[in-house]
């Protein structure tokens, strides 16, 4: 997601690589991978974010996700 972060690219990529390996190990389909990612996001919001901030953060997360999608190339 294209944002300024306090985390290094190396930190993010290392965790992403490990999570990807677990999904590959279990033969997770794209649908299952997205379901798991959604459940992780929901759990983080519900368990680690104040109730008064959850909706705002979820909306910002959704906007960042949409903005990070690549547009199909046209000829």
Curated annotation (Swiss-Prot):
InterPro entries: UPF0352, YejL_sf
Membrane-crossing residue ranges in chain numbering: none
Top-level taxon: Bacteria
UniProt cross-references to HAMAP family, sorted A to Z: UPF0352 (MF_00816)
Family: Belongs to the UPF0352 family.
Protein name as annotated: UPF0352 protein VV1166
Species this chain originates from: Vibrio vulnificus (strain YJ016)
Lineage: Bacteria, Pseudomonadati, Pseudomonadota, Gammaproteobacteria, Vibrionales
